[in-house]
Amino acid sequence: MVGPGLGINRVRRKGVYSTKKGSGDNLLLMKRQGKHDIHDRESDDLSGHDAFSPSKKRGKIDSITEDEIEVKKLSTVATFDKLSRSFPNSEVQAAKNAALRGKEKEEEKVVSIPLIQNLKNEDIESIKCRNNNLLDGKKLLLEAELSAVEDNQIFSSSFPEDKKLSLQSCLSSKEQIIKKLQVREEYMSKFKLPPMLFSDELLTEVEPFMPIVMDILEGKISSVYYFEAKNAFKNSQKAYLSVDEFRKLNLNKFTAGFYGLKRQLRVGEEIAKRYKRALTHNQPATLKWWGITDFCNYVLAPETLTSFCIYQLNLSNKSCSSKTPNKHPKQQLNEKEYYYDPELRMLAYDLLEDTVEYGIIVADSDPIEQWEAAIEEDRLRELKLDVHNYSSRRWRLDTHD
């Protein structure tokens, strides 16, 4: 159908139009009207006359600007230029003003929204530091789960209720020091225990007995501590030793008695350094579950100290075994058969089990480094206690004499 006086064939399909005359004015207007038809389906039932009515055209422009629909600058300018030929200047100017007002409102909305385009350098560094701290915290937490934690609550909760011992007894109050002396005198008279060595002395003395580590890993010798560690692993439902399970362990079964936990952990640390390669290759399931640190601290260290105990106390004199004739301990130092003798080791195991209390209350509160001895004596003077009677130095000197 041809509109009056226009001679235009309109083929309407989703806002696409064609014209025989190629009138630029009508073509641009039709395209603009067609674009609006895509977004506003209500214009589909407009008649051909309505589509080209000046009032309708202006109404469409006003509605577009009122609804704040974005109009491309080039298309808008071209359209208004073409409309100026058929519309009075006042109407065209009003339409332009309306469009400009709509554009200003749009810009105001955009400006009012605070957008963060990028993070400041200091913000990035702050986040990186915070994330690193979190990672370090997780790493520390994992190490605490798989290593010996010198924590009062852990150790105190690990002992039975009837014999609950706490590292709080190692604190330097007057009552605790008096109690420590009583425990020391009781055990020394009953078991004739050797003096407490400083850490450097202890590591030097136990070094010849460390080859037992490889013999345990290779299954050449049975180990009471390994047996207990394996039972703990089998009774666990977790892939590794957790803090909760560690707290539930009875540390009496993993403590080298009168040597105390502090000295035991020093030996375990040295073993982990010396046998790192062997401990990280072909790990048995029990070792994997415990982790290298705890396995060294609570299995290999007490076994090494068991051999040292046999040597220090010359337990062969208390054994009826025919395998241990009257040999000087120094001559027997490198004889594995002597230190691996089941009867001798059972004597040592029993002694260590019976002297756990001594290890916790006495050994762990005795100076482990030589420079700590002076601090101990200064504390005794502050509490107005007799230094000679209460200091650990007395027991080291008297025993050696």
Swiss-Prot record:
Residues 35-48 have a biased composition (Basic and acidic residues). Residues 35-59 are annotated as: Disordered. Keywords: Cytoplasm, Nucleus, Phosphoprotein. Signal peptide: none annotated. SMART domains: RTC4 (SM01312). GO terms for cellular component: cytoplasm; nucleus. It is found in: Cytoplasm; Nucleus. May be involved in a process influencing telomere capping. This is Restriction of telomere capping protein 4. It comes from Saccharomyces cerevisiae (strain ATCC 204508 / S288c).
